[in-house]
From Swiss-Prot:
Organism name: Thermodesulfovibrio yellowstonii (strain ATCC 51303 / DSM 11347 / YP87)
SUPFAM superfamilies: HD-domain/PDEase-like
One Pfam family linked to the record: HD_assoc
One MF annotation (Gene Ontology) recorded for this entry: dGTPase activity
Protein name stated in the entry: Deoxyguanosinetriphosphate triphosphohydrolase-like protein
Domain HD: 75-192
Length: 339
């Protein structure tokens, strides 16, 4: 019995009966030999961490575009916070922590530069539309490793595809595994808490602007809010016998209301909307430039449908700073150097 097999025996004896055991994975798109040390979900996590798309997240917007301060969240710090919250829930529930971590780290790989501004403009311009969660799956299935993809397990791919979506339902049994459902909830817990912190730091709102009903219910500090939400998820799920990852009705209602407050006061704030519009115009200019000059991205031989797809993939993969650099290089006149 090798190291992986011993660990999988530990999973069988320790994890909850409704957990997803690594030995019972539905497998990969392309079958491959098992590793003698790592389980399939551990390998998926490692492949995600070592991918180029994962490294690019450090220069992609969470809410505030290319912030000058050092303490604002980026898309990379966001996925780490989602991972931490989700792993805490998974461990407390005796669910598969490795699977949970892999989904959490991979769930935003398809996010565009400039956050949801990039997603919105690509949705308008690309004939097939655009959703970042679908793009995340496309990244791991096709785009990474020069078109070979990461060949992740079904369970991780399912969790990536079905994580939380904007103002959609927080709780859902859409993800095939309970671990995927954890990440869906963990994503919301992470962003509604860190985005409110960043909004206060940026002067978009003041702490006193947060309604007293939220401060009284969740607590007045970042750590208190997260702790209360996480505990509610854990104990409600246990109480409901793991039917699905759950929140108490009161908590779910308050989280929805708190998220609505964020949309109204932060995401739809005039200052953010103005920057949102600028980012959309910039990315639209780049998109149309590549349509007119497909040779720049080696796409001159492609039919129109494939050309749109390649441009969409190219722009979605950009970081904020690379998009700014490219726009400046193409559209901003340079001063003439005197010999």
């Amino acid at each position: 019995m090798n190291i992986r097999e011993r660990y999988q025996e530990i999973e069988k004896s320790f994890l909850h009966p409704k957990s997803c055991l690594s030995s019972q994975t539905k497998g990969r798109l392309k079958p491959e030999p098992e590793d003698d040390i790592r389980t399939p979900f551990q390998r998926d996590r490692d492949r995600i961490i070592h991918s180029k798309a994962f490294r690019r997240l450090k220069h992609k917007t969470q809410v505030f575009f290319s912030p000058q301060g050092d303490h604002y969240r980026t898309r990379l710090t966001h996925v780490f916070e989602v991972s931490q919250i989700s792993r805490t829930i998974a461990r407390a529930l005796r669910l598969n922590e490795d699977l949970t971590e892999a989904i959490a780290l991979g769930h935003d790989l398809g996010h565009t530069p400039f956050g949801h501004a990039g997603e919105a403009i690509l949705r308008e311009l690309h004939p097939g539309g655009f959703e970042h969660y679908e793009q995340s799956l496309r990244v791991v299935d096709i785009l990474e490793k020069n078109g070979k993809g990461l060949n992740l397990t079904f369970e991780v791919r399912d969790g990536i595809l079905k994580h939380s979506k904007g103002r959609g339902k927080i709780l859902s049994d859409e993800p095939f595994t309970l671990e995927g459902q954890i990440v869906r909830v963990g994503d919301v817990i992470a962003y509604i808490n860190h985005d409110i912190d960043d909004a206060i730091r940026a002067g978009i709102i003041k702490k006193n602007d947060i309604p007293q009903q939220f401060l009284k219910f969740f607590g007045d500090r970042h750590s208190k809010r997260i702790d209360k939400m996480v505990r509610d998820v854990i104990f409600t799920t246990i109480k409901e016998d793991y039917e699905k990852i759950s929140m108490s009705p009161e908590m779910e209602e308050m989280v929805h209301s708190f998220r609505d407050f964020l949309f109204e006061k932060v995401y739809y704030n005039e200052r953010i909307i103005e920057e949102f519009k600028k980012a959309k115009r910039m990315l639209e200019s780049l998109y149309n430039y590549y349509l007119d000059n497909p040779h720049i991205i080696d796409a001159q031989e492609l039919e129109e449908k494939e050309l749109h797809r390649k441009i969409c993939d190219f722009i979605a993969g950009m970081t904020d700073r690379y998009a700014l650099y490219t726009f400046e290089k193409i559209f901003i006149p340079k001063s003439w150097a005197v010999p």
